[in-house]
A protein has these predicted regions:
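Carbohydrate transferase catalytic cores enriched for Leloir-type hexosyltransferases
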Residues: 1-371
Length: 371
């Protein structure tokens, strides 16, 4: 047996997005899978009692600290009480860590779209990614694209990086409960036929171009709506100004952050799900949409073709006309929508948190045997 320590701080965030959901669902799957090895979960605040199921082999360590929790407080914890193996599911190893440490790097988007980050954020991301790649005993990448980026830009050796695909929340499924659907539609009043985007509002998501493409449909006289569901990120303000400039106020609906439990019904009710990102390390939202039986339109860049397979309409994220044409196709062609929905439901069977946990545990055990 070996003591496995996990930085679980992101799993306890109240408003979770990609990396937080990755931490939460992977840790849950690991604890369900492995009842033998003891686990120590590190938090910067006491977690909700029901965040993880109680188990004899799980210890909770809540260590509040105001700033730089990872590099100061978690490092402090590592010095006298290091686990046999430390796993960090979201990018950043503490400065003090055991030699047997594993980190997941989700993407290197800051290299491709530096304008989507502040100067200080770019510097920190560059430093931390390079540091993690050097310092960790092994690195997990979400996709082959991220692995190639780590090899090319951070000089990682290929045998030090393993691709382990994330899973998706099994609660994402076609919503059939009419009462549930009605409650969600009442909570987020969206008239008529609509397409939906789910994710943070930030430049890398390419939402300004999505508005441009949607404006083409509105000018054609289509009675269609766009739902943008997600919390406000960095540089979100120009997006609202652009919507007003295009006179789309009656057709575009910003819901703000939507809790995880409402998303399946919200996505199921949409004609299509669209993710026009300029870069994604994995693109978990397209899996969630496919699991709901909703047709997907996504960019043909970075990891998205790898995740989508043949189950989505792929578009050039820089081509407004192509994006508008893809939206028009799903609005006009019922047969195409049915085919995409069926392909999506088949595609998601390749991904699960159980599979992700098994592959991750194998890496942790391999690192634990290192001398």
């Amino acid at each position: 047996m070996m003591l496995i320590g996990i930085d679980a701080s992101r799993a306890a965030y109240p408003q979770r997005t990609g990396t937080e959901n990755y931490s939460l669902f992977l840790i849950r799957a690991l604890l369900k899978l492995d009842r033998e090895n003891p686990y120590r979960l590190y938090f910067n605040q006491p977690p909700a009692p029901d965040l993880f199921p109680a188990a004899k082999n799980v210890e909770i360590r809540a260590m509040p600290f105001p700033r730089l929790w990872t590099h100061i407080r978690l490092s402090w914890e590592m010095a006298p009480r290091a686990p046999d193996v430390l796993f960090v599911p979201a990018h950043v190893l503490p400065l003090v860590h055991p030699r047997r440490s594993v980190v997941t790097v989700h993407d290197l988007g800051y290299l491709y779209y530096p304008q989507a980050h502040t100067r200080s954020a770019r510097w920190y991301l560059q430093w931390s990614t390079s540091y993690n790649t050097r310092a960790a005993a092994h690195v997990i990448a979400d996709s082959e694209v991220t692995k190639r980026d780590l090899i090319e830009h951070c000089h990682a050796t290929p045998d030090k990086v393993t691709v382990v695909y994330p899973g998706y929340d099994p609660n994402f499924a076609p919503a059939r409960d009419s009462a549930r659907l009605a409650a969600v539609r009442e909570r987020y009043p969206i008239p008529g036929t609509h397409v939906i985007y789910v994710g943070t509002l930030q430049p890398r998501k390419n939402l300004a171009r999505l508005l441009d493409a949607f404006a083409v449909l509105v000018k054609q006289g289509r009675d269609v709506h766009l739902v943008i569901a997600g919390k406000k990120g960095w540089l979100y303000e120009p997006l609202f100004a652009h919507m007003h400039q295009l006179e789309l106020e009656e057709h575009v609906h910003f819901t703000g952050y939507v809790p995880q439990e409402d998303l399946p019904a919200l996505i199921t009710g949409a004609r299509a799900f669209v993710l026009p990102s300029l870069y994604e390390g994995f693109g978990l939202p397209i899996l969630e949409a496919m699991a709901c039986g909703t047709p997907v339109i996504c960019s043909n860049v970075s990891s998205l073709p790898e995740v989508a397979g043949d189950a989505a309409i792929l578009v050039n994220p820089h081509d407004t006309a192509q994006l508008a044409q893809a939206l028009a196709r799903v609005l006009d062609d019922d047969e195409l929508c049915h085919e995409l929905a069926q392909r999506g439901l088949r595609q998601v069977t390749r991904f699960s948190w159980e599979k992700c946990a098994r592959e991750t545990l194998a890496i942790l055990q391999s690192v634990g045997r290192m001398r």
